[in-house]
Amino acid sequence: MIYGIGTDICDVRRIRASLERHGDRFAEKVLAEGELATWRARRARWPERGIRFVATRFSAKEAFSKAIGMGMVMPMTWRSCEVIKLPSGQPAIVLHGALKEWFEARNLQVHLSVTDESDYAASFCVVERRA
């Protein structure tokens, strides 16, 4: 049964401006530990790809927060929601702390799709209650 659906479109130029204005602090606020390591590696190889990495994670977390119906309110925090890439290349969400407990108590699962182009990142998220 569908619990919630969320979508988000993120302007990559806004993320670029935030990173220029706030430096690493912006990424450290939005990204979980594993995401930070990936971002730093991508940024070192190709700075523009690092910016798009942050934009896709920002977009995915916004879409997820909408799908669970709470926005960015506890227990939903930027860093308690981590977007990973499975070996197949499929994006997935790993939850931490109180958000993980909240999610598991409701017997929910999440499906995520993420895409990006030069100026925009977009995400679509479906959360369903397990049978």
Curated annotation (Swiss-Prot):
Origin: domain of life: Bacteria
Annotated family: Belongs to the P-Pant transferase superfamily. AcpS family.
Subcellular localization(s) per the UniProt record: Cytoplasm
Indicate where this protein is primarily found.
cytoplasm
Q: Which GO terms describe its cellular component?
A: cytoplasm
Q: What function does the entry list?
A: Transfers the 4'-phosphopantetheine moiety from coenzyme A to a Ser of acyl-carrier-protein.
Protein name per Swiss-Prot or TrEMBL? Holo-[acyl-carrier-protein] synthase
In the UniProt record, the gene name given for this protein reads acpS
